[in-house]
Amino acid sequence: MVENIGSGSAELVSYAKLNLYLDVLGKRSDGYHEIVGLFQTISLHDTLTVEICDRGFYLESSVALPSDNTIKRAWEMFRKNTGKEFGLKVTLKKEIPVGSGLGGGSSNAAAVLRYLGEVFKIPLEDLLNIAAQVGSDVPFFLYGGTALVRGRGEIVEKLEDIEGYSVDLFFPGIHSSTKEMYLSLTPEMYRKGPGRVEELHRAYLERNYEKIKELSYNVFEKVFLEKHPEVMDGLRNFGDGSIVKMMTGSGSVFFALYPLDKGNYSFVGGV
C-alpha cells in the first residue's frame, strides 16, 4: 500500500506474514533448502516513509538494523538490475519484531521494491527477479495475501485469499537465527509434514477447523522448542480456545488462530 504524503515522499505499509504450513524437502546443490509452505499476510505492519533523492542511501529506523539490511539491499539490487541511478531516504517505524519469523525484513524490502517499481514503471516479472536476489521471502511479499511458496522461497503461486480469520501472537523475546535453525535440521527431519498444502488451503476456505488442525505443520517448531524449552511455560497460557496454535517461520513467534475477529490481527489479502 502506497500513500503520497507530499514533498515527494510516500508512506508504505509493510505487512507481517504467517506460515500456516512450512516443511523442508531437502538441501539443494546451491546450499539452500527446498521448502514448501502456505504463506499468509496479517494486519501487523511496519510503516516506511520513502523519498527518492539524487544520490546515496539514508535510513532512520526506530530499531537498530545491520548495515547490510534488506531495505538497502533492495535499493542496491534495483539499481543494479534496472540501471537506474538515484538515491533513497527511508524512515522506518518498526512494529514487527526482529528475528520473530514474521518476515519483517523481507516485507520491508518488498514494500520498497513495489514502490520503486511504480515510480520507474518496472513490470512485476522483473521485480520478482530482483526480489529473489534480495532474500528468499521477498518475492512472496510482492503479492501478499495467501500463496503457495516453493523452491527456496522464490517460486510463488498466488492462491485465493483466505478471509475471516484472526490471530493472537506470542513473542517469547528470543531472536531466532534463520541460518542457525536451518543448520539444526537433519535429513531425518525432511518431508515429515502431511504435505497436503492445497488441501489445507481448501480447509481454510471451507472453514473445516478439524482439517486445519490436522494438516497444519512447521518443521522448525520441534527444533526451536528443544533449543528453548523455557518457552513452553508461556505457551501453556496462550491460545485458549484457538483452532490451532503453532510457530511461524524459523521462530520465535507462535500464533493462535481464531475465526473472525477474536484475535488482535486479521488476515490481509494481497494484490
Curated annotation (Swiss-Prot):
Signal peptide: none annotated. Pathway: Isoprenoid biosynthesis; isopentenyl diphosphate biosynthesis via DXP pathway; isopentenyl diphosphate from 1-deoxy-D-xylulose 5-phosphate: step 3/6. Pfam families: GHMP_kinases_N. InterPro entries: GHMP_kinase_C_sf, GHMP_kinase_N_dom, IspE, Ribosomal_Su5_D2-typ_SF, Ribsml_uS5_D2-typ_fold_subgr. Keywords: ATP-binding, Isoprene biosynthesis, Kinase, Nucleotide-binding, Transferase. GO terms for molecular function: 4-(cytidine 5'-diphospho)-2-C-methyl-D-erythritol kinase activity; ATP binding. ATP binds at residues 97-107. SUPFAM superfamilies: GHMP Kinase, C-terminal domain, Ribosomal protein S5 domain 2-like. The keyword Nucleotide-binding applies. HAMAP family: IspE (MF_00061). This is 4-diphosphocytidyl-2-C-methyl-D-erythritol kinase.
